[in-house]
Amino acid sequence: MLLKKAPAYRKAEKEDFSMIREFIRRNYKDRWEFEETHTEKRLTRLFFYTYMIYRDSVTVATYRDQVVGVLITGKESHGHFAPIFRLKKGYHFLRLKFTKEGRKNLEHFNKLQDMKKQLTVSPEKPTPGNILFLYVSKDYRRNGIGTGLLKQISTEKDTDYSIYMDQLDQRTFMESHGFVKKNEVSQMRELNKKRFRESVAFYKKEPHCETHS
């Protein structure tokens, strides 16, 4: 869809949370393995509450009062106290542990976390901020919304951001915005009875890199 006017950008509000959860579901549904809809719902909420605990900022793109994109930044090693979010995350984690589908997806989630740890930059130069989640609704892509979201953090903070990306993420898009792959690891995975090599790469953007439109 070609937009007739430029989208607006602002900090997320509580009323946006349901749409952000929907974006998380859309982004990850092809990476999870499930037959029961409650498994998908619990995984979505587990990821959402995890992002809320570790967030620095949550920026949304809106078009005609509709949320069409979101960018969440934060530090996975420095979470907020956030007792309500932590309680809800723990609840959905336990519900997933009680089912075979849930345990299988949690096992894969833990493997991905281990892969990320292998890619972590040296402790002598830690990365100040991570992009935890970036998503633009498919109907509104190719309108510069992803670029606009990245510009929000480039103007708000003078820092170098990093992002972990797997083979289903838009790596070419991030590379066009100055992100450079620093390292990559892979492992074999079975999803829906198909085996494939899953990879996770660590991308980093140096400060003052220009953002392409």
Give the label of every model feature segment.
Residues 7-22, 33:
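A short beta-loop-alpha structural element at the N-terminal edge
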Residues 22-38, 77-78:
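Helix-loop element at the rim of GNAT/NAT acetyltransferase active sites that forms part
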Residues 36-58, 63-64, 72:
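Active-site rim helix/loop that mediates acceptor-substrate recognition in acyltransferases
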Residues 60, 66-75, 117-121, 130-135:
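Conserved beta-strand in the GNAT
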Residues 77-130, 191-194:
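Conserved acyl-donor/pantetheine-binding loop and adjacent beta-alpha core of acyl/acetyltransferases
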Residues 128-129, 156-168:
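Conserved GNAT acetyl-CoA-binding A-motif
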Residues 136, 142-155:
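Conserved acetyl-CoA-binding loop-helix of GNAT-fold acetyltransferases
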